[in-house]
Amino acid sequence: MDSKKIILVIVVIIIVAILAFTYISANSHTSKIEVESNKTLKNGDSFVVVLKDDRKNVIPNQVIDFKILDDKGWATKYNATTDENGHATVKLFALENGNYTVHSVYNGTIFLSKSKSISDLNIDDGYDKY
């Protein structure tokens, strides 16, 4: 293959790469996780978040990772897939009464940015743990 053909192939590859980058940039959106649950729940209740884009459209069929940390730093991990309304739900169980921090993370896609939410949660089943 002569040098003119090689240069032509390289130019075509560069143009395709620029067009792909432009398309992805023009169609990319930021995402946001919004907590819909109360700050005080009990075992058996559900912790619910909704995933939305920058236009406030809900985002279905995406995985949200949850990490619930107690006061001592011990973590319980869950994941849930958003439904047709953008809601991801985790049913809480076997958590002692007390304060927790919930980290909710969406890892994004090629068209949606990664997002996370950190929220406080209090588990109160109506009894003392001692």
Language-model features, listed with the residues they occupy:
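Secretory targeting signatures
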Residues: 1-29
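Ser/Thr/Pro/Gly-rich low-complexity linker/stalk segments immediately outside membranes or between
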Residues: 24-40
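Extracellular interdomain linker/stem segments of modular secreted and single-pass surface proteins
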Residues: 29-30, 122-130
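Beta-strand-rich structural segments
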Residues: 37-56, 68, 104
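Short flexible loop/turn segments that cap and initiate beta-strands
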Residues: 54-79
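Glycine-centered loop-to-beta-strand initiation motif
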Residues: 76-78, 82-90
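Surface-exposed, short loops/turns at beta-strand junctions within beta-sandwich domains
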Residues: 93-98
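Enriched for extracellular/lumenal, surface-exposed ectodomains of secreted and cell-surface proteins
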Residues: 100-119
